């Protein structure tokens, strides 16, 4: 590794690292390998130039990836260790993946043996499921965004196109590479999110087992035609179970497409499934409560105070101590097993059991947050939990036309201006100039600070004059129709008051 003096002007910001060679160069930055001085472990550092990002309007993409990766701790999602901001650059310190992209691995080896393809696919599904359970849809899953560490384990990366899913809000932005994009995405239709990632996983599984893509054509219109029609062929060398699973994932109708849970339960997926992938995915709230005692002691040995480290970890703070902790933790378990998650989970169970047994002797030996459930129970659950069913909006079995008629009547009664945005989608505007709105505004404003009920961009010392929102009707899997209202701008509490008034006007739901 080269010293800081040769870091190209990054020495002050990256004083805790020795910069090495450049791994890749992009349009608004580069990725370098580096060594963390304190622990000696390698990391990858994205160096993003702020001015170039602004010029290319890519700031939001970078912010989105940082926000998501800060939330996630999973053995098959790339780890974010810290983010360093300077006036000119943003430095994103991430897990280093020695063997690069899965894409290059497939190109080099061609189609994989079924057992190896299954191992990789199991890890991908584990990471994708974790994203979905934390209300994040990746939207750009492809072998180029799947990295391989020193043990050839998969790490989901590049969350720049990802979206946080909100209850009742569909996505419409067309993201990702055309070859891996679902039919509803390239058609510009509204989609909820998870089913899009399922389609991309189906394309990736096909590529792993066949060494080629199911949908490929140099002519983009022809490519789109194949995707929209679900036109592809299954090679004869595929096993019967693989031939059953792939078509279930590549179903054109997203409502009929297999779900992540159903993939998990499929017989092909279950073969040689590692124990740590067979148990429920870890919960981010529970993860923050668990601290590995051995790794904690290693950090203390580096000169950090134990209580300070514990408090920082509990509160998910970024500082030198927590960066060292996670680097040591990841590299410890990566060195002992190809499956980081299995050793990680078993070690945490051992340490947390040790903490629990010594609780009566001293409360200071417990390093998980108060209020948590049995700290070692989650890893011992024998059965996969029932999948959560999200109710997005108001459910009704009435016919769409009948529902929309009642919606329009309610909007008219409340003096709402609306504009058709699609067959069952409309943009609405409600002015606070009307008596009922003014009354609500007075009530809310009397006890709520403006900055609390504003959007970030609306904090200007006064309440906006209007509420803008969208109404959308869509069909669910169980033959029900769901009516959703999504606030765009305006005071949150006033919007909730409007929703209550709107509900009283509806007679069909």
Curated annotation (Swiss-Prot):
One protein family per Pfam: UBA
Top-level EC class: transferase
Record PROSITE patterns: KA1, PROTEIN_KINASE_ATP, PROTEIN_KINASE_DOM, PROTEIN_KINASE_ST, UBA
Cystine pairings recorded for this chain: none
Residue numbers binding ATP: 23-31, 46
Record Gene3D superfamilies: Kinase associated domain 1, KA1, Transferase(Phosphotransferase) domain 1
Keywords associated with the record: ATP-binding, Kinase, Nucleotide-binding, Nucleus, Serine/threonine-protein kinase, Transferase
Summary of the tissues where the protein is detected: Strongly expressed in immature seeds. Mostly expressed in panicles, leaf sheaths and roots, and to a lower extent, in germinating seeds and leaf blades.
GO molecular function: ATP binding; protein serine kinase activity; protein serine/threonine kinase activity
Domain UBA per the UniProt entry, residue ranges: 290-330
EC annotation from Swiss-Prot or TrEMBL: 2.7.11.1
Domain Protein kinase: 17-269
Highest taxon above the source species: Eukaryota
Catalyzed reactions per annotation: L-seryl-[protein] + ATP = O-phospho-L-seryl-[protein] + ADP + H(+); L-threonyl-[protein] + ATP = O-phospho-L-threonyl-[protein] + ADP + H(+)
Active-site residue numbers: 140 (proton acceptor)
UniProt domain KA1: residue ranges: 460-508
GO cellular component: nucleus
Keyword Iron-sulfur: no
Subcellular location: Nucleus
Biological role stated in the UniProt entry: Suppressor of flowering in long days (LD) via the that up-regulation of HD1 and the down-regulation of EHD1. Can phosphorylate HD1 in the presence of HDR1.
Similarity section: Belongs to the protein kinase superfamily. Ser/Thr protein kinase family.
Subunit text: Interacts with HDR1.
Protein name, per record: Serine/threonine protein kinase OSK4
Species per Swiss-Prot/TrEMBL record: Oryza sativa subsp. japonica
Lineage of source species: Eukaryota, Viridiplantae, Streptophyta, Embryophyta, Tracheophyta
Gene name for this UniProt entry: OSK4
């Amino acid at each position: 590794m080269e010293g800081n003096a040769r870091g190209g002007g990054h020495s002050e910001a990256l004083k805790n690292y020795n910069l090495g060679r450049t791994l890749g160069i992009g349009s608004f930055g580069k990725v370098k390998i580096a060594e963390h001085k304190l622990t000696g472990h390698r990391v990858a550092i994205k160096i993003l130039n702020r001015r170039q990002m602004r010029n290319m309007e890519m700031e939001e993409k970078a912010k989105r990836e940082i926000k998501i990766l800060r939330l996630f701790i999973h053995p098959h999602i790339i780890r974010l260790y810290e983010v360093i901001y300077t006036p000119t650059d943003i430095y994103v310190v991430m897990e280093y993946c020695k063997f690069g992209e899965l894409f290059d691995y497939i190109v080099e080896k061609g189609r994989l043996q079924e057992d190896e393809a299954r191992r990789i696919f199991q890890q991908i599904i584990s990471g994708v499921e974790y994203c979905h359970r934390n209300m994040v849809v990746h939207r750009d899953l492809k072998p180029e965004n799947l990295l391989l560490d020193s043990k050839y384990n998969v790490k989901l990366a590049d969350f720049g196109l990802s979206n946080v899913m909100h209850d009742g809000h569909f996505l419409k932005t067309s993201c990702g590479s055309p070859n891996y994009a679902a039919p509803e995405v390239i058609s510009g239709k509204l989609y909820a999110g998870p089913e899009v990632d399922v389609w991309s996983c189906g394309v990736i599984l096909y590529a792993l087992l066949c060494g080629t893509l199911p949908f490929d054509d140099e002519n983009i219109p022809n490519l789109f035609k194949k995707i929209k029609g679900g036109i592809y062929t299954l090679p004869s060398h595929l096993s019967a179970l693989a031939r059953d699973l792939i078509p279930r994932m590549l179903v054109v109708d997203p409502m009929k497409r297999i779900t992540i849970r159903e993939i998990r339960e499929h017989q092909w997926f279950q073969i040689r499934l590692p124990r740590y992938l067979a148990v429920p995915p870890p919960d981010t709230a529970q993860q923050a409560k668990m601290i590995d005692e051995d790794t904690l002691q290693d950090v203390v040995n580096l000169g950090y105070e134990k209580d300070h480290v514990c408090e920082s970890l509990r509160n998910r703070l970024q500082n030198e101590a927590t960066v060292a902790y996670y680097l040591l933790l990841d590299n410890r378990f990566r060195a002992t097993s190809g499956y980081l998650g299995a050793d990680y989970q078993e070690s945490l169970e051992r340490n947390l059991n040790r903490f629990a047994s010594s609780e009566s002797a001293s409360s200071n030996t417990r390093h998980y947050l108060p209020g948590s459930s049995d700290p070692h129970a989650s890893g011992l659950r024998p059965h996969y939990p029932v999948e959560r069913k999200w109710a997005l909006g108001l459910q009704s079995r009435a016919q769409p036309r009948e529902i929309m008629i009642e919606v329009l009547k309610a909007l008219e009664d409340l003096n709402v201006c609306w504009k058709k945005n699609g067959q069952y989608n409309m943009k609405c505007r409600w002015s606070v100039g009307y008596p009922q709105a003014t009354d609500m505004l007075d009530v809310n404003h009397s006890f709520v600070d403006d900055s609390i009920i504003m959007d970030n961009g609306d904090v200007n010392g006064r309440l906006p004059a209007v509420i803008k929102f969208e109404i959308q009707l869509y069909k669910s899997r169980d033959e029900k129709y769901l009516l959703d209202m999504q606030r765009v701008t305006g005071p949150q509490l006033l919007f909730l008051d409007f929703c209550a008034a709107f509900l009283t006007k509806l007679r069909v739901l």
